[in-house]
C-alpha cells in the first residue's frame, strides 16, 4: 500500500504464471494451483488487517482465486462480509482479475428454507452472498453438499437459472456422491451450463476421491477438481510431531480430536516428515505437492493465518516430483 493506505497490486504478480496456473477441465478458466480459502481466519472474530495482509500477499503473488461459502465465519456470513469490505477497500479495481466463488447447502438461517438444496434456498442464499460481498456476480457458485431429499433436477435447474440470470458465471458441486455427480454432469451439459469443477477432501491421509472413482470421472470428463483440507486440519504439518501445542486445533478438540493422532499415525507422520526433510521441504510443502501431482487435480485450497504461512505453502508449486 502507498503512504495514503491505498492498495496497489504488485506489478509482477503474474511473473510465475507458467508454473502457477492450470486449466480447469476443458474450460477457458486457468486457476492458480494454490487457491485461498476463507473458511477460517476471515470471520468477524478475526483481525481485518491480518485478513487484508493475507489477501494482498496472495494476489500480489498470482493467487487470483478466493473461495468462500455463505456460512464461513464465524459467525455465518462474516467471511463474505470481510470479502465485501476487501472489495470496497482494495480489490474493486481488480475485480476482473479475481475468480471468486461461494457456496450454499449447509444451514444458514432458521426455518425450513435455510438449508440443503431447494430452489428457494439456493436463490435466496446467493442474493444474500452478493450483497455481503458487494458483488454483482460470483465467478463460481457451488452446491455445497448433496441433498438426498430434494430432487436433483430442482437443485440443478436453480443453478442453471442462476447462470442465466447473470449472478454466476460457472457452476460447481462439492462432495456429491459419484452417481449424483454423473447425473449433474449430464444435466448441466444438456442445458449449456457445463460443470466447471468438483470440490472434495483429498490429502495424503484421505484418498476417498481416488478410491471411489470421483477423481477419475472428473479427469475423464473434463471437470476440474479442487481439494480442501489438504493438510488434514494440520496433521500433515510438523505441528503435532512432538506433542499437542496448547494453542492448536487439536487442543481445542473442535474439528480435530485427540483420538485422531494414534501412535500408528504419529509414526507415519514422522516418516513423512523425514522424507520431506530429505527433499529440503517441510511436511506441509510435501503434502501439498503430493495433491497437486495427482492426476486430475486442478488446484488446492489452503487457509492461512499469516502471510508467512501462505508464502511457505506456495513453495509446493515448484516442488520436485514425488516417487508415489
Put a short name on every predicted segment.
Residues 24, 36, 51, 58, ...:
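Conserved, mostly hydrophobic/aromatic
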Residues 46-50, 78, 82, 113-121, ...:
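Alpha-helix N-cap and loop-to-helix initiation/capping positions
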Residues 110-142, 201-205:
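Active-site gating/metal-coordination segments in enzymes
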Amino acid at each position: 500500500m502507498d503512504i495514503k493506505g491505498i492498495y496497489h497490486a504488485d506489478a509482477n504478480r503474474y511473473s510465475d504464471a507458467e508454473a502457477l496456473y492450470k486449466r480447469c477441465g476443458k474450460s477457458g478458466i486457468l486457476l492458480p494451483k494454490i487457491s485461498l480459502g476463507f473458511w477460517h481466519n476471515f470471520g468477524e472474530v478475526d483481525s481485518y488487517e491480518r485478513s487484508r495482509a493475507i489477501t494482498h500477499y496472495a494476489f500480489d503473488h498470482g493467487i487470483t482465486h478466493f473461495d468462500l461459502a455463505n456460512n464461513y465465519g464465524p459467525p455465518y456470513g462474516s467471511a463474505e462480509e470481510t470479502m465485501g469490505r476487501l472489495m470496497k477497500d482494495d480489490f474493486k479495481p481488480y475485480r476482473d482479475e479475481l475468480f471468486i466463488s461461494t457456496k450454499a447447502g449447509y444451514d444458514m438461517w432458521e426455518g425450513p428454507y435455510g438449508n440443503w438444496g431447494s430452489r428457494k434456498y439456493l436463490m435466496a442464499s446467493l442474493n444474500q452472498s452478493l450483497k455481503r460481498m458487494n458483488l454483482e456476480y460470483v465467478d463460481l457458485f457451488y452446491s455445497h453438499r448433496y441433498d438426498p431429499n430434494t430432487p436433483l433436477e430442482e437443485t440443478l435447474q436453480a443453478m442453471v437459472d442462476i447462470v442465466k440470470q447473470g449472478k454466476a458465471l460457472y457452476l460447481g458441486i462439492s462432495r456429491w456422491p459419484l452417481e449424483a455427480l454423473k447425473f449433474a454432469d449430464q444435466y448441466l451439459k444438456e442445458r449449456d451450463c457445463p460443470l466447471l469443477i468438483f470440490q472434495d477432501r483429498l490429502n495424503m491421509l484421505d484418498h476417498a476421491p481416488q478410491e471411489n472413482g470421483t477423481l477419475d470421472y472428473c479427469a475423464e470428463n473434463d471437470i476440474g477438481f479442487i481439494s480442501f483440507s489438504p493438510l488434514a486440519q494440520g496433521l500433515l504439518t510438523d505441528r503435532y510431531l512432538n506433542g499437542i501445542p496448547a494453542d492448536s486445533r487439536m487442543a481445542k478438540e473442535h474439528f480435530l480430536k485427540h483420538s485422531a493422532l494414534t501412535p500408528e499415525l504419529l509414526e507415519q507422520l514422522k516418516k513423512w516428515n523425514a522424507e520431506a526433510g530429505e527433499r529440503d521441504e517441510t511436511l506441509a510443502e510435501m503434502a501439498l505437492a503430493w495433491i497437486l501431482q495427482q492426476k486430475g487435480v486442478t488446484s488446492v485450497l489452503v487457509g492461512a493465518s499469516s502471510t508467512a504461512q501462505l508464502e511457505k505453502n506456495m513453495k509446493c508449486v515448484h516442488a520436485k516430483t514425488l516417487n508415489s
